[in-house]
């Protein structure tokens, strides 16, 4: 007759030890006797098997098997058969559920909008799996819905879940089984197993069971010779006791024995056997007790406090290294337990820095592995009709481009080119877009093509063709398929043609030979996961017809759930795991990280589809049990802590931090205070405080010691108090060949000041030439920051250009369109009519827009809309130009007038050369948007008009002019005055105005829109185009700028405001001609000074600060110069904003006259 036994006792009382001793004794007495089965959680099976393997008297076992529930069922089916259905993996089930959601979307009441999300099918799969574990069928769900009054949302929710659940069961019926279905069939077939009837079964490592597992235990108790269950409980069945969970499990086991009329034997374990000292015994015995006696701690329990999470992990790593060195412990004797996933990620990066071997007992998603990323990108390329982003991701995985040397470099060139040309869709297949000559036109600064660059461009084209050919073959194979099976076959055959299987296996072997066993294993699992997903699709959906889109969606769902299952790479390594899941029994040293409130105890929340209230109501009405609710789980938090800390036999270290990764404040766990209260002398060790008083505690590993040394030496250089130990450590490491490696790089960072080297004159000439031919903007760029000039014109770094409309593109368009129209009407805007404005605008745009960025403005609906907006802006601009011309005596004389030292035609203007202090010529070139002139008797006056599409840049700031940050307008005026004969101007030609015209889309704001009429609106629109800049204060010039000037008149076309007495108000922007000439002369001196500095080789990172702003904010070279306010602020040049530039120039002029 069967027996049901329960081994109960507190943690460390020897339950598992007694079980193993019993089994080993039986094995020694009769090695080939009746089977012995140990059922344990998956995480524990390897450890239990090792117990038998390591026993020298056994050397393994033929009689005893360590299995989890699912493996036991497979073992029985191997014996008796009966499982004819195909096994449906987790991925297969999720694919089925996703397909059901799409097929029955219209029948859903609540979740229609969620069906398109892959994550929702995973969530629904979890909920259905939960129902199966607790023996709830779709019929029971539907019955509950029909028989009970429910809130509408709850009713709709359960209806949708039941609907999907029922359809899933129908698809599985007679064809497939899930893991839960396998266990139900196992229960049905258990009676037929002769092997099981002879077996003695031990169940260890569990604290509670699901309804399905209880049913298995009940059936095992009926069939097997004996069943013994080990539980960590003292038998206290108080619902609020520490052992609530396991005592509840014990009650269920007793009910099974009573229900089946089976002998039930309770064996209590009371003697502590695990703990090697009184500290841990007292901790286990008194934790969570209301009444306890305090004990004196003997140093086997530590509590560490750190400032932040990273330092907490570093402190634990240092302690492990110290114990390994001083106490001669092995890494396999150490376990680190955490609750917050943040710690797992940190340990993965920190522990290798300390050379600590470790194994983290978690499953990682395969999603981000390069091979998986390549597969998913390939799917997205097909689904998105060859979009840029997935295609470039495909290239960047380097999986399909392994055969190309420097494939990353070639991919970068390809990406730059494709970004600039806007290659997408079918353009990838058009050879005219991928010619070597086209590649050489790439970028803003084009360089002559060398043989080497030509060869590189050819390799880029070859690489692109190689990958595109593979995608085309893959796309063609999919296009010929129409069922799940044919799609899966096409998929695999395409990858076979890619030679991918052999490539990956070769790579795996190379990784193994190089000692990178984990990476090799990951590669293996990724490929097997890929094949498994294809098999699942072919098996589950078979010959069912489906669209390519549906197949790719289902395939992506399958890939999404793939996870790595990594086995330990060595036996001597630190075990790392979650406090909730890790099975780490009898470790000598346990570290419990993250002992903060909110983590331990954790604020439990229900993340499932069904809320806790819905669960409780369901359980009350149906008398069926479901998975525990959040409030029940919350009651077990002390038990989680208890189980974790009692895994240690020698030492426990608790740690917590005062700040999280996001600098959020953290509170210590209340359990820490509870633990401290158990002892008379258990203090908290602040790691930072301890390190300050004894720096040697930080010096456990060379790499980490160097980092800490760097921080301490930095404090020392800043005249902060530093322990002598650090300076001694520095000297010791400096003179040790092994320890000094890398030290120089760290110490050089201490004195790093981002200082550049001044070029010698020969190198300057090699970079810039023996004369400077440059635009005005180049000199302005140097004045903003010398290093910016060095990178752009010395190193000639080429910033990436993109296939999109930039601000400078808009400016070029407006310049070209206005030049085209001005030439058509011979510069006379006054006679334009609304009809002629519309006609000329359309004609100009039709001629000019197709030339912009490879016809960018016709590439999409958005850019076609932008073309319409550009046309509207041009029409508004022409209306404003007509209005301004009507009231001005100045007439346009030239448009887009270029200038240089040696004009190539009579159309160009000549610019006199300047000379640096080294005698090098400065030849300035550029283009003046518009030159307006006014002739009066024997004098001519000149207006320089510059079109700006940015309102910010369309302001003449005389302070910036003085400092050489704004040199354009004075340069243009100087060039025009030099060329009065070429422009047929009078012998006496003087400045009229230096004015900016803001080309923009006008917007009108009214305080009271009810009072607005069309005339007022038009008036405000025209006023928004008012010219801005500086005007000659000569009365004749003022009258010519606006013929309507009179007292109390403020011009709406130029910056002139006349007062009541005919004088100019302060808001007028005017200066006499002598002042303008002084600015022109000062501007020339700025050119000479800047050019001289350039040829002297100045390259320093020294941006000029103006109005609390640095040019770095919009600089494209920040990633090159590494400008840092902490390091470089002392080198910033600052504009004196208190100066009056006009007064300062006049003062300098007076001083020159006195000399």
From Swiss-Prot:
MF term (GO), any: helicase activity
Cofactor(s) needed for function: Mg(2+); [4Fe-4S] cluster
Claim: Transport is one of the keywords in the record: no
Listed Gene3D superfamilies: 3.90.320.10, P-loop containing nucleotide triphosphate hydrolases
Co-factor binding comment: Binds 1 [4Fe-4S] cluster.
Binding site for ATP: 9-16
Alphabetized SUPFAM superfamilies for the sequence: P-loop containing nucleoside triphosphate hydrolases
Entries under InterPro entries matching the protein: ADDB_N, DNA_helicase_suAddB, DNA_helicase_UvrD-like_C, P-loop_NTPase, PDDEXK-like_dom_sf, PDDEXK_AddAB-type
GO biological process: double-strand break repair via homologous recombination
Entry EC no(s): 3.1.-.-
Residues that bind [4Fe-4S] cluster: 785, 1112, 1115, 1121
Domain UvrD-like helicase C-terminal: 270-584
Entry keyword set: 4Fe-4S, ATP-binding, DNA damage, DNA repair, DNA-binding, Exonuclease, Helicase, Hydrolase, Iron, Iron-sulfur, Metal-binding, Nuclease, Nucleotide-binding
Coiled-coil regions, chain positions: none
Residues covered by the UvrD-like helicase ATP-binding domain: 1-278
Top-level division of the source organism's lineage: Bacteria
Family of the protein in this entry: Belongs to the helicase family. AddB/RexB type 1 subfamily.
Misc remark: Despite having conserved helicase domains, this subunit does not have helicase activity.
Subunit structure: Heterodimer of AddA and AddB.
Function of the molecule: The heterodimer acts as both an ATP-dependent DNA helicase and an ATP-dependent, dual-direction single-stranded exonuclease. Recognizes the chi site generating a DNA molecule suitable for the initiation of homologous recombination. The AddB subunit has 5' -> 3' nuclease activity but not helicase activity.
NCBIfam families, per the entry: addB_Gpos
Name of the molecule in the record: ATP-dependent helicase/deoxyribonuclease subunit B
Organism this protein belongs to: Staphylococcus carnosus (strain TM300)
